[in-house]
């Protein structure tokens, strides 16, 4: 059940309009990246965290890690220009466990139960992701007009973590690099390489903090969690 997790944290999150790495933004007084890291710090099966960063932000990340006193080993690795390159750098630093997870630094609300289901499924099948069924009606648009309505019963929104047998993910990244293929997530690289990826149904609270509105939602979730602790 043990695993390592790669957390890409090098992006600047331009849609957040924060003027800095969005992972340094605080939610309830604690930086977003710390909320995310604590999820894995509090899970005994997580044996190592590989944090992929912008080299220019090494000092800021190093200070945060010292301030919040993590017991789980955390290795900082320099990332690339694209998220895919950053994840590739992260998995190159992995290898102590057979299973590796990839998780967005800006998704601090993944629950342990889904991580555990995901790791078990990945051990069984080689690759698995957390996802949720699409709730909204999806339109295909061309030149500013609706060109069709997509049947949503088979549509799922991919989230992270995404879990893989390390050899499968490494081979998928190597093939993508050789082809010049740039995927939208790591599962898409495995698909492109001819592999199959299983689905674990997660929940809609596992949001990625992308815009200022998402921070308001995050604050509300954290406030609700705090209240529940005292019930």
Swiss-Prot record:
Residues with site note (Positions MEP for the nucleophilic attack): 152, 208
Catalytically driven reaction(s): 2-C-methyl-D-erythritol 4-phosphate + CTP + H(+) = 4-CDP-2-C-methyl-D-erythritol + diphosphate
Gene3D superfamilies in the cross-refs: Spore Coat Polysaccharide Biosynthesis Protein SpsA, Chain A (3.90.550.10)
Alphabetical UniProt keywords: Isoprene biosynthesis, Nucleotidyltransferase, Transferase
PROSITE patterns: ISPD
Transferase is among the record's keywords: yes
Gene Ontology terms for molecular function: 2-C-methyl-D-erythritol 4-phosphate cytidylyltransferase activity
InterPro entries referenced in this protein's UniProt entry, alphabetically: IspD, IspD/TarI, IspD/TarI_cytidylyltransf_bact, ISPD_synthase_CS, Nucleotide-diphossugar_trans
Membrane-crossing residue ranges in chain numbering: none
Keyword Oxidoreductase: no
PANTHER family hit by this protein: 2-C-METHYL-D-ERYTHRITOL 4-PHOSPHATE CYTIDYLYLTRANSFERASE, CHLOROPLASTIC
Name the record gives this protein: 2-C-methyl-D-erythritol 4-phosphate cytidylyltransferase
Source organism: Bacillus licheniformis (strain ATCC 14580 / DSM 13 / JCM 2505 / CCUG 7422 / NBRC 12200 / NCIMB 9375 / NCTC 10341 / NRRL NRS-1264 / Gibson 46)
Gene that produces this protein: ispD
